[in-house]
Amino acid sequence: MMKSFFLVVTILALTLPFLGAQEQNQEQPIRCEKEERFFNDKIAKYIPIQYVLSRYPSYGLNYYQQKPVALINNQFLPYPYYAKPAAVRSPAQILQWQVLPNTVPAKSCQAQPTTMTRHPHPHLSFMAIPPKKNQDKTEIPTINTIVSVEPTSTPTTEAIENTVATLEASSEVIESVPETNTAQVTSTVV
């Protein structure tokens, strides 16, 4: 885009002195009997537009797309490509996916109608080329030099009392005296 802009500015900068000289000659009284022209009118009037279009193919019809290899749905692409899915969506939803109107400058001086749409030519830019991996490099494993301190576990002892009433089948009156068993349980608390 910038190359084409600089190209147009350069061509205009080269042609403006000739056009300015012609206007100055018209303002001054004619000193010579014979009117001299240093350039051909037929060539000069075609320089700004037709010369650029015919000499530089980037301004003319571009049959081969000169775009970098990138995904179609890439968010960094400056031009919008909308994929039209075939069988995934219903026809009512497919109508929402339309190609934006043509923003390419017209080849002639006349403005193009806005109803004309740009149909992208099929190209292989949807294939992403993976970067080359350097096989010469060997990966150096990273060693964590910071040692994490783990808390030490301290055993705790708890006394658990099991109260079990033993009933014996006898004719004597048995008082319900519970037996107490004491067991030590060790657990690690972090």
From Swiss-Prot:
GO biological process, one term: protein stabilization
Cell compartments where the protein resides: Secreted
Modified residues (Phosphoserine): 148, 170, 187
Pfam family of the protein (one): Casein_kappa
Residues bearing the modification Phosphothreonine: 166
A single cellular component GO annotation: extracellular space
Keywords for this protein: Glycoprotein, Milk protein, Phosphoprotein, Secreted, Signal
UniProt signal peptide: 1-21
Annotated site residues (Cleavage) in this chain: 126-127
Keyword Translocase included in the entry's annotation: no
Family per record: Belongs to the kappa-casein family.
Function: Kappa-casein stabilizes micelle formation, preventing casein precipitation in milk.
Name of this chain's protein: Kappa-casein
Gene name per UniProt: CSN3
